[in-house]
């Protein structure tokens, strides 16, 4: 989700989820910063599942001799609840943009010492000063992208650029649709599908989307996270998911397609933060 304007009502398709070298190198520098606090030569990274490039960790371990232990989560709420409860002993976390202010307000993440992050100045200008973290005082960019719908074209050959894929599945997909457990994205897609705006406080609109989701849920197969593999292996024929993850599924199975709902869809950015007790 990008700052105070978390949605896109597109006229044309954007690019797939982007893994920008500058962002990854900056994230690696934050790993290095956190490692300075690791007296035992270990670093605990708490990140979304199936999201961390193993090559990045291998490179970091080879260059520093510090072992990275990766623990994953499946939603922003899961990550926040676990850290807030005091569990895990993690050093780094990767919250989405709209959750960063919550982490900061709760005192769960540190203000960054920019003198130890020389490449901080190399962050692309559009990401350097953002509404959810002014001046990038607490985070550095990790990745950004969009949330949409993935469909296996062997199961369904109709229009996939619509949230009807999960809000009102066609007969071919009834009982074959997965929905990600990241409820911010699901609510954003659903609100725009019924004619509302993401982050609305309109009670009647929220009731409308609640009723629409409850009506749709019996037609779903699951609410699960690991769709990169499951879409690639035909275990699931359609899913609400993220464009980068589905692109990886498509590398294994070219029948997997990604749709950008014409009703609107969320854009997001995930950023790396150093936990207060790291």
Roles of regions detected by a PLM:
Residues 1-19:
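Short, Lys/Arg-enriched N-terminal segments with co-localized hydrophobic residues
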Residues 20-39:
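Gram-negative bacterial Sec-dependent N-terminal signal peptides
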Residues 50-52, 76-78, 98-102, 146-147, ...:
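Solvent-exposed loop/turn segments at secondary-structure junctions
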Residues 89, 94-235:
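Extracytoplasmic ligand-binding site segments that recognize negatively charged/polar headgroups
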Residues 99-102, 232, 237-255:
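A ligand-binding cleft/hinge motif common to bilobed small-molecule-binding domains
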Residues 40-102:
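Early extracytoplasmic/lumenal segment of secretory-pathway proteins
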Residues 69-71, 178, 221-222, 257-259:
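General small-molecule cofactor/ligand-binding pocket signal
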Residues 122, 206-214, 250-276:
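Periplasmic-binding protein-like
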